[in-house]
A protein has these predicted regions:
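Short helix-capping and inter-helix turn/linker motifs at the boundaries of alpha-helical repeat units
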Residues: 39, 154, 201-202
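Short linear motifs at protein or domain termini
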Residues: 1-129, 240-250
Length: 250
């Protein structure tokens, strides 16, 4: 009697199930394997991107496939897929035969913040118009909780990303969310947070408060203006950071 299943060991005879059942089981298993592989690729991508964002791999750092696989406990195939994806997104660039973390020059930095101000301002405007009451309450709670993180720039930076992501989602515009995801992935190349600059944390929380207040009031113009002002001040702080770093290297 022949048996149906992976490697002939599923435990159900062909007499009972028939050949079609074997085919179905094989297809289902194939889909499960594809899902697992896609999950691994996604996880490897996220792990590497988070490591860049947290400064573990700074601009100019070489990304070695075998080292990444060992660090994250992932096989080399999903690591390779993730590196290819990051290269396509220009977060990694080729230097000879090596892949290195990309860096942003002054013009690229200015372009990034200009696009971010436009898109995030629009997201805030749309959130004021379309956000559910529950979403607005979540934003309010975030501001209250984040104020307790002043003094911990790394934790506040993570909270800041969650806050901005919540505004993106509250816009209820999937195409805008997609573009903002790309912008924020590129922000990972900055490696350091402007919230570490003295006084910036308190100021940023106040700016978040103004954004949420405008969204609560359903005032799209005010929400747009508050978000743009927030990005403008963040860019100004970033420029000071870059200038200070350049002086340190001189």
């Amino acid at each position: 009697m022949r048996w149906c299943g992976r490697n002939g060991g599923f435990g159900m005879p062909l007499v009972a199930l028939g050949r079609s059942a074997c085919k179905v089981e094989t297809i289902v298993y194939g889909k499960l394997r594809m899902t697992e592989e896609k999950s691994l690729h996604k996880d490897a991508y996220t792990l590497i991107l988070d490591a860049i964002d947290e400064g573990l791999y700074r601009p100019g750092a070489r990304m070695v496939e075998s080292e990444l696989a060992e660090r994250f406990g992932v096989s080399r195939t999903p690591i390779r897929e993730a590196l290819q994806r990051l290269e396509t997104q220009r977060l990694l660039i080729r230097e000879g035969r090596s892949l290195i973390v990309a860096s942003l020059d002054h013009n690229q930095l200015a372009e990034l913040y200009a696009v971010r101000a436009e898109l995030e301002g629009l997201a805030a405007r749309l959130a004021a118009q379309h956000a559910a009451a529950e979403e607005v309450r979540v934003l309010r709670k975030m501001v209250e909780e984040d104020s307790r993180l002043i003094g911990d720039p790394a934790a506040l930076a993570r909270a800041n990303r969650r806050f901005h992501k919540q505004i993106h989602l509250a816009s209820h515009n999937r195409y805008l969310v997609r573009q903002l995801d790309l912008v924020h992935r590129t922000m990972a190349l900055l490696a350091t947070t402007s919230l570490a600059v003295e006084g910036r944390s308190q100021t940023a929380i106040g700016e978040h408060e103004a954004i949420v207040r405008a969204i609560e009031a359903r005032d799209g113009d005010a929400a747009d203006a508050a978000l743009r002002a927030h990005i403008s001040r963040a860019f100004e702080t970033r420029l000071r950071l870059v200038s200070a770093a350049a002086e340190g290297l001189a």
